[in-house]
Amino acid sequence: MVERDDYAAIRDRIIGLSHTHGLRCDWAETTKRQRFLLLWDAEGRVAARAIVPLYPGETPHLVDSLERGLAHLFGDDWLEDP
């Protein structure tokens, strides 16, 4: 299982799954506490938008929201290791 309170582990999981699904990640610093993520498909369309908390241990509700928000691309339990 990916550590739900570890930003780097969550980020790496998103990047790995994105490559597997043929998506490109664009990251932007929204605030000092979170990153905005855009996932682009091969045709250049935005497949998903998400907020990724930099300190997920402090904001577990944002991790839950992130997991739900990307489930349509990666599956319901995408934060679980394969």
Where are the predicted features?
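Basic nucleic-acid-binding interfaces
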Residues: 1-29, 38-82
